[in-house]
Amino acid sequence: MLKEIKTKTKERMLKTIQSFYNDIKGIRTGRASASLLDGIVVNIYGGHQKLNQVAGVSVTDNKTLLIKVWDIGVIGEVKNAILNANLNLNPVVEGNTIRIVLPDLTQETRERLVKLLHQFAENARVAIRNIRRDIMEEIERMQENKKISEDDFHNAKKEIQNITDDNIKKIDGELSIKEKDILNY
C-alpha cells in the first residue's frame, strides 16, 4: 500500500515537473529556438491548429527562425498568429516561408523574463509541496486508522520528503540553467 502511495506521489510530481518544463520552454533566451513557437495556435480551416501542424520550424542561425508553411494559402494566418502571440517577434513573409529575426534582448527584457521564470518555478514548487501535503495527510489517516504501523508511517513520511526535495532540486537546477541562458547570452 505504501509502495502505491510512493508511486502515485512520483507520478503526480513528475506531471508538475513536465508542466514546469513546458512553461519555461516558451521563455525566450538570447538564442533562436524552434520551441519558442510551440504554443502558437493558428486559426485556419474553420478551426484551430498548432503551428507545428501547418508548418515546419527550423533554426538557421543563433538569431533566425525559418518557418516553412506547407499550404501557402494560409501564410497570412500563420503570420497573424505569430504577431498575436505577444512574443515581440516581427515575422517577414518570403514566398512560402516566414523568416523571424529575433531582436537582441535588452537588459530590461532579460530581467522581466527572469522574473517570469522565477514565477513559474515558484508555482511549480508550490504545486510539489501541495502534493506532498496531500500525500502526508493520506498517510496520517492510514496511521490513525491503524492501516500502517508507526514505523511505516515515519519511513513513509521520510521517503515522501526525499521525493519532494529531489523534485524541488530539479526545478531549481532547470531554473538556474535557463536563468544563465537568459542573462548571459
Swiss-Prot record:
GO molecular function terms attached to this record: ribosomal large subunit binding
GO cellular component, one term: cytoplasm
Domain of life: Bacteria
GO BP term, pick one: translational termination
Annotated signal sequence range: none
Name assigned to this protein: Ribosome-recycling factor
Function description: Responsible for the release of ribosomes from messenger RNA at the termination of protein biosynthesis. May increase the efficiency of translation by recycling ribosomes from one round of translation to another.
Localisation: Cytoplasm
Alphabetical list of InterPro entries matching this protein: Ribosome_recyc_fac, Ribosome_recyc_fac_dom, RRF_sf
Keyword entries, A-Z: Cytoplasm, Protein biosynthesis
Gene3D superfamilies to which the protein is assigned, alphabetical: 3.30.1360.40, Ribosome-recycling factor
Family indicated by similarity: Belongs to the RRF family.
Location, primary (coarse class): cytoplasm
